[in-house]
Curated annotation (Swiss-Prot):
This is ATP-dependent Clp protease proteolytic subunit 2. The gene is clpP2. Belongs to the peptidase S14 family. Its main location: cytoplasm. It is an enzyme of class 3 (hydrolase). The active site is at residues 98, 123.
């Protein structure tokens, strides 16, 4: 079971305790710090939509430290990021692999960051296939469709050709922070919040 830290704030009317994620949300910070599952996606989407309703123009910061996860869950977050009217600053801390890398690249261009020792990885979708021969054919066709779909998204986000994305994704394709800049996944390596375009990363 994951332990969620609580922080205590002095509100002027006394002290108030809240979980750390709620406190970060006050600063328009959303954290993706685990495998990307449907429940996690629903939570992240709800946070993003809440922040949009609070202020549709102010930047949102999304910090990613994830090994990836379910494609449909990741695409739901991706579509929501694109749906928002405000800029979304993405940060890789630790790792952004698979769907995590796609979400990292989905941030507003010029505002996609990685910390110096971060690692990023892209690869083709995979899944266990069981059932009748007809079921197996359908699932295999769906995986191929998703492979092309994800390659198109990464191509749009990175500027790489679809063909190169597909070729590189045939195996786990790892990148360090500087390599991720060259690839187009991120725009800048930062070691301090002062290095970003958002001077209010943490208030």
């Amino acid at each position: 079971m994951t332990l969620v830290p609580y922080v205590v704030e002095d509100t002027g009317r006394g002290e108030r305790a809240m979980d750390i994620y709620s406190r970060l949300l006050k600063d328009r910070i959303v954290m993706i710090g685990q495998e990307i599952t449907e429940p996690l996606a629903n939570t992240v989407i709800a946070q993003l939509l809440f922040l949009m309703s609070e202020d549709p123009k102010k930047d949102i910061k999304v910090f990613i430290n994830s090994p990836g996860g379910y494609i449909t869950a990741g695409l739901a977050i991706y579509d929501t990021i694109r749906f928002l009217g405000c800029d979304v600053n993405t940060y890789c801390i630790g790792q952004a692999a698979s769907m995590g890398a796609l979400l990292l690249s989905a941030g507003t261009k010029g505002k996609r960051y990685a910390l110096p020792h971060s690692r990023m990885m892209i690869h083709q979708p995979s899944g266990g296939i069981i059932g009748t021969s007809a079921d197996i054919q359908l699932q295999a066709a769906e995986i191929l469709t998703l492979k092309k779909h994800l390659a198109n998204i990464l191509s749009e986000c990175t500027g790489q050709s679809v063909e190169k994305i597909i070729e590189d994704s045939e195996r786990d394709f790892f990148m360090g922070a500087e390599e991720a800049i060259s690839y187009g996944l991120i725009d800048k390596v930062v070691s301090s919040a002062k290095d970003t375009k958002d001077k209010d990363t943490i208030s």
